[in-house]
Amino acid sequence: MFSRIAAVSFLALPLLAAATPVLRRGDCNTGPIQCCQSTETAGSAAGSALLGLLGVVVQSVDVVLGLNCSPISVIGVGSGSACDASPVCCENNSVGGIISIGCVPIQL
């Protein structure tokens, strides 16, 4: 009986490993890769002041904001046009080009 359980477990292990998603470096599942000059949390002095000036309300003070962001092409990541500041993936890049909301830092 034990040998059957061991055999089934051993044969099922590769199925579990194959079903696990793996994100590659530079992948974004929240939005396009952006290069931001700086990042702040919504609860920081700079973040809350900027959100107040723009009249933007966010759900949490822990939301990461990208400031002065520009898009990075995936093709350019390895060829010298990489981001020297803060590479991030952001959910909402439509706040006038000044601020991006819901950013997640990534490694290029």
UniProtKB/Swiss-Prot annotation:
Matches recorded under Pfam families: Hydrophobin (PF01185)
Tissue note: Highky expressed in hyphae cultured in liquid medium.
The keyword Disulfide bond is annotated on this UniProt entry: yes
Subcellular location: Secreted; Secreted, Cell wall
Signal peptide segment: 1-19
GO cellular component: extracellular region; fungal-type cell wall
Free-text biotechnology note from the record: HgfII displays a better dispersion and emulsion stability in an aqueous solution with soybean oil than hgfI, which is of great significance in terms of expanding practical applications of class I hydrophobins.
InterPro entries: Hydrophobin (IPR001338)
List of glycosylated residues: 92
Record has Glycoprotein as a keyword: yes
Disulfide bridge positions per record: 28-89, 35-83, 36-69, 90-103
Alphabetic keyword roster: Cell wall, Disulfide bond, Glycoprotein, Secreted, Signal
Protein family per UniProt: Belongs to the fungal hydrophobin family.
Function: Aerial growth, conidiation, and dispersal of filamentous fungi in the environment rely upon a capability of their secreting small amphipathic proteins called hydrophobins (HPBs) with low sequence identity. Class I can self-assemble into an outermost layer of rodlet bundles on aerial cell surfaces, conferring cellular hydrophobicity that supports fungal growth, development and dispersal; whereas Class II form highly ordered films at water-air interfaces through intermolecular interactions but contribute nothing to the rodlet structure.
Protein name stated in the entry: Class I hydrophobin hgfII
The organism of origin for this protein: Grifola frondosa (Maitake)
